[in-house]
């Protein structure tokens, strides 16, 4: 038989709040009046977690008896499985709020929906308890709620379109009119408790994009990157290391670095189905020297490089700028940004198969390849030795000619291997190795190859750095990159990052000094507090000893009092006996006097 529960004065209770902002919540209190049998009178309670308007003492008020209930048992969750639809009480703002579990998360966390006001908040299991209704003398557990599941049902993670980005949000509830939804911003790194609620149209919402397994992204791939709590459309501009990419957004050429896990391919949600985003259309086609087609487009992924591979037979994308010679009607090669051209300077190009180059149209005179392709490296079985720069025509900044001569001939096959690496092609180099003119001819190519090996080794060494790297090692790396820069290596990015790391190390050193100061101060404060605590403990101990002594004296006095009381009782008893004897003597004395008078008054 279920045991009935009754509450009495001085019991801990929970009080239901009717205030608009606190409606639906229970707060702990001490009952300061005994309940009445009728249940109509208001009872005085003293809250344990709420203060009065002056915030100096616990809040006390008179509450209807029907809003007061006992405190549920501590083991109320024993044997209860937390599932979607379970009614629970969540500990929030110093009280227990009634809600419904709408979604189970990882690590024993749950999303709880509250009806008044409408909201969804994430809680750990230790902050939840199963909801029970109080009948007046016993607890009753209500049935689980039946949740209706849909694409945009309560507790569903969706994405909200904002300008050109998609922001993760969570659906709180569907409003009755106009197919609108109440949502709030959502991020798995925090509980979204303080997020602002928004009312949005259903056309701006879509489900969370399903995860796609992408091995790696290539240069110029159109992607979406997670930046500032939103998915933004961008283009891969560089591959830093395996699993890390440089992505730019919009018209700007500035790129930011992202992990592979923070990048996804763009997709579109149409008619309840996910589709891959269609490729950008070709815009315009022109002719270059009658034999070469130039097309304007923004190619997705590495489609541009694949077209060149298929039609020209070259292993990688060409990285030259093609210009039209106005006087001769011929095409002359312009050197790439890394300083490599063809084997020798040529005034006329030999007959070649028709090749398509993807490019943008120039504002004045001539056409050039897409600037993004210029960052790639020309692969050839024959290594260049002399490079000639040529401007397109007199209409463009006047014609200038510069000749760059390498101090050696590239004979080793390792050049092709190094120059084809993505980490080398992703940055524009102007390798000239001019300091090698001061060395012997036989050693120059070996020195240059050694510098290539050193360059890649330094990049790997930089990648493997850890937070506790000494400043001397960073300075050594900086000096090594600076030495490579003298030979034409583009080390702007590594040097910039090393400078940032050095600045961070200075900041780290400053913070460590601050921490040492704080540690010393905390140690002193702790020692001071410990001494004060020990002194207080000693005083308490002394007071306890005094209390014990006083208690001993009190006990002795009580014993003495009892003894004196016994003596007093004995004395009183003796006095009573003496009074009785005195009375008897007085009677006897009166008898003597009476007899004396009788004798005197007797007749003769």
Curated annotation (Swiss-Prot):
Key words of the record: Coiled coil, Growth regulation, Transport
UniProt cross-references to SMART domains, sorted A to Z: Agenet
Coiled-coil segments: 520-575
Tissue-wise expression: Expressed in flowers and siliques, and at lower levels in leaves and stems.
Region (Disordered): 269-308, 327-350
Residues in DUF724 domain copies: 405-603
Signal sequence coordinates: none
Task performed by this protein: May be involved in the polar growth of plant cells via transportation of RNAs.
Protein name, as recorded: DUF724 domain-containing protein 2
């Amino acid at each position: 038989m279920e045991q009935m529960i009754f509450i009495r004065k001085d019991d801990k209770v929970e009080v239901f709040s009717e205030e608009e902002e606190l409606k639906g919540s229970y707060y702990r209190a001490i009952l300061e009046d005994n309940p009445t049998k009728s249940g109509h009178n208001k009872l005085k309670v003293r809250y344990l977690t709420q203060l009065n308007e002056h915030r100096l003492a616990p809040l006390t008020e008179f509450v209807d008896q029907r809003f007061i209930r006992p405190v549920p048992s501590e083991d109320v969750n024993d044997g209860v499985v937390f599932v979607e639809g379970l009614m629970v009480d969540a500990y929030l703002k110093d009280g227990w709020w009634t809600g419904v579990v709408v979604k189970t998360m990882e690590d024993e966390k749950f999303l709880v929906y509250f009806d008044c006001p409408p909201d969804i908040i994430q809680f750990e299991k230790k902050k939840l308890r199963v909801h029970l209704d109080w009948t007046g003398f016993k607890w009753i557990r209500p049935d689980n709620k039946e949740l209706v599941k849909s694409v945009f049902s309560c507790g569903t993670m969706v994405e909200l379109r904002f300008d050109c980005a998609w922001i993760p949000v969570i659906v709180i509830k569907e409003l009755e009119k106009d197919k609108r939804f109440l949502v709030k911003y959502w991020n798995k790194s925090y509980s979204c408790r303080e997020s602002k609620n928004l009312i949005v149209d259903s056309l701006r919402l879509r489900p969370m994009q399903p995860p796609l397994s992408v091995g790696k992204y290539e240069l110029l791939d159109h992607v979406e990157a997670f930046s500032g709590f939103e998915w933004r459309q961008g283009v891969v501009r560089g591959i830093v290391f395996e699993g890390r990419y440089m992505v730019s957004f919009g018209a700007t050429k500035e790129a930011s670095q992202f992990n592979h896990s923070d990048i996804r391919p763009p997709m579109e949600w149409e008619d309840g189905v996910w589709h891959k985003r269609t490729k950008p259309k070709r815009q315009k086609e022109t002719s270059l020297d009658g034999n070469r087609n130039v097309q304007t487009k923004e190619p997705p992924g590495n489609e541009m490089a694949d077209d060149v591979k298929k039609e020209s037979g070259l292993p990688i994308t060409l990285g030259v700028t093609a210009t039209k010679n106005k006087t001769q009607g011929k095409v002359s090669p312009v050197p790439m940004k890394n300083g490599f051209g063809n084997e020798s300077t040529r005034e006329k190009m030999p007959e070649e198969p028709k090749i398509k180059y993807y490019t943008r149209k120039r504002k004045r005179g001539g056409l050039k390849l897409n600037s993004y392709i210029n960052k790639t490296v020309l692969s050839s079985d024959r290594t260049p030795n002399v490079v000639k720069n040529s401007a397109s025509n007199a209409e463009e900044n006047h014609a200038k000619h510069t000749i760059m001569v390498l101090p050696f001939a590239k004979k080793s096959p390792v050049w092709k291997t190094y120059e084809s690496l993505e980490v080398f092609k992703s940055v524009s180099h102007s390798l000239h190795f001019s300091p090698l003119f001061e060395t012997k001819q036989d050693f120059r190519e070996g020195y240059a190859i050694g510098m290539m090996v050193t360059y890649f080794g330094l990049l790997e060494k930089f990648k493997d750095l850890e937070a506790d790297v000494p400043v001397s090692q960073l300075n050594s790396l900086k000096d090594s990159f600076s030495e490579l820069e003298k030979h034409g290596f583009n080390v702007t990015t590594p040097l910039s990052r090393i400078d940032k790391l050095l600045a961070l190390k200075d900041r780290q050193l400053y913070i460590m000094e601050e921490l040492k100061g704080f540690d010393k101060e905390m140690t002193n404060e702790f020692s001071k507090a410990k001494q004060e605590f020990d002194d207080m403990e000693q005083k308490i101990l002394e007071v306890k000893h005094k209390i014990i002594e006083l208690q001993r004296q009190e006990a002795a006095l009580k014993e003495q009092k009892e003894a004196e009381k016994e003596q007093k009782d004995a004395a009183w008893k003796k006095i009573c006996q003496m009074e009785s004897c005195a009375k008897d003597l007085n009677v006897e004395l009166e008898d003597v006097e009476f007899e004396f008078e009788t004798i005197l008054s007797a007749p003769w």
